């Protein structure tokens, strides 16, 4: 098994605590409201496993994440994608480490480290990461637009 890591930073005018609440703490409720392709998000067991189900006809049926850390004091979350169509037969898991920090005039910088844990001797291609990052940024931009349009939400 190999590991390929990528880092990324994104800035936004949204305060870090608001963005963390929206993207991490209340994502089970907010994401299905904002993204019609997401049917629902189910918590399993003690809540450390989250299953995101997609609507019928979507190219992705579901994704399952294991939540390792949600630190609302330091605005950090760590989780891994452990099941789902995205992993295919080449990936064991994908780990995410996100930190939300104050930046600029009340805004935020979101710093992420993504680690792809591959099966066997498979080497991840940059294009595969770029596609996943593109989809993640689409979600980020949708939530950002919602928070900008609704300044009292998660305030």
Curated annotation (Swiss-Prot):
Ribosomal protein in keyword set: no
Induction remark: By wounding and fungal elicitor.
GO biological process: abscisic acid-activated signaling pathway; defense response
Record keywords, A-Z: Pathogenesis-related protein, Plant defense
Family: Belongs to the BetVI family.
Protein name: Pathogenesis-related protein STH-2
UniProt key word Transcription: no
Segment forming the signal sequence: none
A Gene Ontology cellular-component term: nucleus
GO molecular function: abscisic acid binding; protein phosphatase inhibitor activity; signaling receptor activity
